[in-house]
UniProtKB/Swiss-Prot annotation:
Gene3D superfamilies per record: Metal-dependent hydrolases
GO BP field: bacterial-type flagellum-dependent swarming motility
Broad enzyme group: hydrolase
Keywords: Hydrolase, Metal-binding, Zinc
Keyword hit for Nucleus: no
Residues bound to Zn(2+) 2: H15, H40, H194
Oligomer status and interactors: Homotrimer.
EC number(s) recorded for this UniProt protein: 3.1.3.-
Cofactor binding remark: Binds 3 Zn(2+) ions per subunit.
Name of protein: Probable phosphatase YpAngola_A2446
Length: 245
């Protein structure tokens, strides 16, 4: 069990079913020490309004010993790597995930998908690329792993890709984990929970990690401190309320 979950959605993304309060309660049951709420960026049809992300400053940082990060799963929009988290929104979030979603960036060929993903990393704002193993978006796996290491961006192993969505992702996810291992990059684990009961469930990710002998020291979820150190190293401000996690 990893004590950090970096990808989940609330009822603010209306195809999800749990609230922030639900996730806090579930985290306490599962001994999850830190999680990031990452609702969809505003270019998705059922995403929260811009104001939702700007007003996350009202959230407490720590509730009953559980740390809460303010995040977003932004959408990669084009071949230039532009995303729908810009301007003041960049300062409103602690954790910025970005990925491909069909309503915003329809699947293209391997060269175009690879170009867009690497361009997104090169812009310097994104911390994690979400579900890069989606078979609908073929990419040059060694190239994206090398770019992720170069730009200090984590590639995600998404547990939901093995269970509920993006069928056929497993072979790509295994290859991505191995390529990130060889490139010396970071892996991030995300439950991609759309209901609180799935918080912190990484069983499929853990199997892939074991199969490719991925080093634990390159997984962001190993401890709250590792994730917070990474974000600070990437230029995010220190969060004093979470210093003791």
């Amino acid at each position: 069990m990893y004590p950090v979950d970096l990808h989940m959605h609330t009822v603010a993304s209306t195809h999800a079913y749990s609230t922030l309060h639900d996730y806090i309660a579930e985290a306490k049951l599962k001994n999850i020490k830190l999680f990031a709420i990452t609702d969809h960026g505003p270019d998705m049809a059922d995403a929260p309004h811009y104001w939702h992300f700007m007003n996350m400053r009202v959230w407490p940082r720590l509730v009953d010993g559980v740390g809460i990060l303010r995040g977003i799963e932004a959408n990669i929009k084009n071949l230039d790597g532009d995303i729908d988290c810009t301007g003041p929104m960049l300062d409103a979030v602690d954790l910025l995930i970005a990925g491909f979603h069909e309503p915003v960036f329809p699947p293209q060929d391997k060269a175009a998908n690879t170009q867009a993903m690497i361009a997104t990393m090169a812009q310097g704002n994104v911390h994690i690329i979400s579900h890069p193993g989606n078979p609908k978006y073929p990419v040059d796996i060694p190239a994206i792993a090398q770019a992720a290491a170069k730009y200090n961006v984590a590639l995600e192993l998404n547990n939901s890709s093995f269970a509920h969505s993006r069928k056929g992702s497993e072979a790509n996810c295994r290859a991505i984990a191995a390529a990130v291992r060889d490139a010396g990059g970071w892996l991030a684990l995300g439950s991609d929970s759309h209901i609180a009961y799935a918080l912190g469930i990484f069983e499929h990710c853990e199997r892939i990690i074991a199969e490719v002998n991925f080093p634990q020291e390159r997984i962001l979820n190993v401890s709250p401190r590792r994730l917070l150190d990474y974000l600070e190293q990437r230029g995010r401000p220190v969060i004093p309320e979470l210093a003791e996690l």
